[in-house]
Amino acid sequence: MCAESAKICARSRRHSIDDLLSEIHTRAQQYYFSEQIAELAYQALIKEARLTPKPGLVDSTNNGSHQDMSLSTFEQSAIALRPFFTQFVLMGIETTNLPDSHILSKIRPLGLQAEQAMFVATNQVNTHKGAIFAFGLVCTALGRHFSRWQNKMMSSPSFEISQDTTGISLISETVARFTQGITDELKNYSKNQPLTAGITLYQQYGFTGARGEAEKGFPLVQQAVVFILSQAESEMRWYWALLYLMANNNDTNIVHRGGINGLQFIQDEAHKRLGNAKNLQNANALMASLREFDDDCIARNLSPGGSADLLALTIFFLSLLYC
């Protein structure tokens, strides 16, 4: 409640019973909200992993273009990451008064801890590094907004994300402010530093990958959400979202494996399927088309892992609208 030692406060009875009860209530609200968000994030990762079929990606039928991971690897990874999503939300609450520009450096250590937990759970396999980055930022932004709502409780009876896309845009804009200038890490690369895959792809093609998507406030995810909401309610909507993301995302995971030609193949094939009304509206036709696409991706050793991360975030954002 204050900067003083709890022992000293207790002896002097500095805080009234009402103040103590109010503080307990506030902290309970914060933890409950953080747990709610963490569960939605966890469920989004699980739903994305289990969605089948997914071209080139691990699903319940096969391991896609991967030899070192399976569906159970992703499930174990998601379990390991769930507590960290809670901590990201709480971090957003605790740092609510800090400038936006200070947040990234504050949450980076927690992100690195989450990565280590992932590697322990998966026996050193990178299942969710991109998701940790995206969800860490979004969960922190949600915590920040929740804390600011708590400070205005008298004028608003409950905290909720807008039932249209306004709330999603607000959270995404906050992430953009958190990450402003993050792509400078690619632009101002020192020749004395190790040459990473991300740096190489930026130098060759100007692709900014996950950094660029976050810095712009996840425009592809926001577009995918709008695309889904513009369609009739259907159990196939997550497949539509995945195809939309694959068609429009300059996925550095694909370029790393298959070069610019591999990316062009993925985008062209996804666009083709999005343009086929029969595929979109007929479940059997869509499943058959996706299985064919999956076979082609596996044959070319292509995996749209970046789009998979964005799909998980799309699922998460949609769940916020309906929770």
UniProtKB/Swiss-Prot annotation:
Which keywords are on file for this protein? ATP-binding, Nucleotide-binding, Transferase
Name the catalysed reactions.
Answer: 3'-dephospho-CoA + ATP = 2'-(5''-triphospho-alpha-D-ribosyl)-3'-dephospho-CoA + adenine
Tell me the domain of life.
Bacteria
MF terms in GO: ATP binding; triphosphoribosyl-dephospho-CoA synthase activity
Q: Does the UniProt entry include the keyword Transferase?
A: yes
User: Which Enzyme Commission number(s) are listed?
Assistant: 2.4.2.52
In Gene Ontology terms, what is a biological process of this protein? prosthetic group biosynthetic process
Pfam entry (one): CitG
Q: Which InterPro entries match?
A: CitG, TriPribosyl-deP-CoA_syn_CitG
Which PANTHER family does this UniProt record tie to the protein? Answer: 2-(5''-TRIPHOSPHORIBOSYL)-3'-DEPHOSPHOCOENZYME-A SYNTHASE (PTHR30201:SF2), TRIPHOSPHORIBOSYL-DEPHOSPHO-COA SYNTHASE (PTHR30201)
By sequence similarity, the record places it as follows: Belongs to the CitG/MdcB family.
Q: What does this protein do?
A: Catalyzes the formation of 2-(5''-triphosphoribosyl)-3'-dephosphocoenzyme-A, the precursor of the prosthetic group of the holo-acyl carrier protein (gamma chain) of citrate lyase, from ATP and dephospho-CoA.
- Supply the name of the protein: 2-(5''-triphosphoribosyl)-3'-dephosphocoenzyme-A synthase
Which organism's genome codes for this protein? Haemophilus ducreyi (strain 35000HP / ATCC 700724)
